[in-house]
Design a protein with these regions (language model features):
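Outer-membrane beta-barrel strand-turn architecture
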Residues: 20, 60-64, 108-112, 165-167, ...
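Short glycine/proline- and aromatic-enriched beta-strand/turn motifs that initiate or cap beta-hairpins
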Residues: 20-60, 127-129, 135-140, 207, ...
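Residues that define the transmembrane beta-barrel architecture of outer-membrane proteins
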Residues: 22, 46-52, 94-100, 151-157, ...
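Repeated loop/turn-to-beta-strand initiation elements of outer-membrane beta-barrel proteins
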Residues: 24, 64-68, 114, 167-173
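Glycine- and aromatic-enriched membrane insertion/assembly motifs of diderm outer-membrane
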Residues: 25-27, 43-90, 94
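Transmembrane beta-strands of outer-membrane beta-barrel pores
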Residues: 30-36, 60, 74-78, 96, ...
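Extracellular loop and loop/strand-boundary signature of outer-membrane beta-barrel proteins
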Residues: 38-45, 85-92, 141-147, 193-200
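Predominantly the C-terminal beta-signal and adjacent terminal strand-loop region
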Residues: 73-81, 145-216
Length: 216
C-alpha cells in the first residue's frame, strides 16, 4: 500500500509537470465519515466522525470539457465510536490524514459565468495519526496505528458534482467509499508467518464531503 501511495503521488506530480493548461486551487470543506463494521454475519455502524479538510488542488484541462483533478489535502476527523464486542474501539476517536485524489472529470457551461461538473476516481488516503480515548480520559488514550488496530492506508472510490462560478469559485459535494478493510493485526491477530488472520472481521469507511475552493 505504501508503494501504491508513492505511485499516486508520483503520478500527481507528473500530471502537474506535463499540463499545457492547468488551474491551481485552494480549498476546504466539511467531512462526515461513517464506519461500517462487519463481524461474522452481523453488520453495524461503529459511529460517525465529523471534521474538515484543507489543501490545494491542480485541475488539468484536456479539452472538450474533459479534465483531470489531483492535489494534496489534510483532513481532521473526530467523534465518539463504539463496537460492543471490541472494547479497544470504543471512546472518543481523533484522526489526522493526508489525501491524494486522482479523478477524471467532465464540465459543461450552464449559464453566464456558470458551469457544472462531475468527476470520478480514487482518493489515496494515508493516516498520520489515529487515537482513541475510552470514556474521554486522556490517560487512557491509545494509538490505534502503533498497536495495529487500524490500517493507515485506504483507497476511496467516489464521485463529486458541483459548479464553478465566474471561473473563481468552486462548490462541490461528493461521496467516497473506502475499498480496503481498515482492521489491522491488532484486531484480527497474526498467523505464524506474520500475515494478518482472516477472522471474518472487517471495517469499511465511507464519507460525504462538501467543499468550497478558490481558483487561481
Amino acid at each position: 500500500m505504501k508503494r501504491l501511495l508513492s505511485i499516486a503521488l508520483a503520478a500527481s506530480m507528473m500530471l502537474i509537470g506535463t499540463s499545457a493548461f492547468a488551474q491551481v486551487s485552494v480549498g476546504a470543506g466539511y467531512i462526515n465519515e461513517t464506519n461500517k463494521v462487519k463481524i461474522g454475519d452481523s453488520s453495524n455502524s461503529m459511529g460517525a466522525l465529523n471534521g474538515f479538510y484543507a489543501g490545494f488542488g491542480y485541475d488539468i484541462n484536456e479539452g472538450e470539457g474533459f479534465g483531470i483533478s489531483t492535489g494534496l489535502y489534510y483532513s481532521f476527523l473526530t467523534g465518539n465510536v463504539s463496537v460492543p464486542s471490541l472494547s479497544v474501539l470504543s471512546g472518543d476517536m481523533t484522526e489526522h490524514a493526508l489525501n491524494i485524489p486522482v479523478k477524471a472529470g467532465f464540465s459543461v457551461p450552464v449559464g453566464s459565468g456558470l458551469s457544472g461538473f462531475v468527476n470520478v476516481g480514487p482518493t489515496f488516503v494515508c493516516g498520520l495519526s489515529s487515537t482513541i480515548k475510552p470514556l474521554g480520559v486522556d490517560l487512557l488514550k491509545t494509538d490505534l496505528y502503533k498497536h495495529e488496530y487500524l490500517s493507515r492506508f485506504d483507497i476511496k472510490l467516489g464521485a463529486n458534482i458541483g459548479a464553478v462560478v465566474n471561473n473563481m469559485f468552486r462548490i462541490s459535494v461528493g461521496y467516497d467509499y473506502g475499498c480496503l478493510d481498515q482492521f489491522g493485526a491488532g484486531i484480527k491477530g497474526k498467523n505464524d508467518d506474520g500475515s494478518t488472520k482472516d477472522r471474518g472481521y472487517s471495517l469499511n469507511r465511507s464519507r460525504i464531503v462538501v467543499g468550497l475552493a478558490l481558483l487561481f
